[in-house]
Amino acid sequence: MKKDIIEFEDIIGRYFNLKINNQNYRIYVEEAGSGIPLICLHTAGSDGRQFRHILNDKKITDKYRVIVFDLPWHGKSNPP
């Protein structure tokens, strides 16, 4: 039997739009898993990629819905 050569990760990435004080923000978020929400906030000058290992950790995503977002001006999120 031929083994699959492509293996997809369970991470889902998408954008959401947020309006605060008449200012529009387009924020990129990735999530994986189900259960108790676990929100990961990246450090200054970085983006959500620093949590890639958590998003791919089955021991964590079996118990938690891991949510990672890029702050405005970081990663895939646009400036306001």
PLM regions and their residue ranges:
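Alpha/beta-hydrolase fold catalytic core
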Residues: M1-L38, T61-Y64
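Conserved HGGG/HGGXW glycine-rich cap/lid loop of the alpha/beta-hydrolase fold
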Residues: Y28-K76
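Gly/Ser-rich "nucleophile elbow"/oxyanion-hole loop immediately N-terminal to the catalytic nucleophile
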Residues: P80
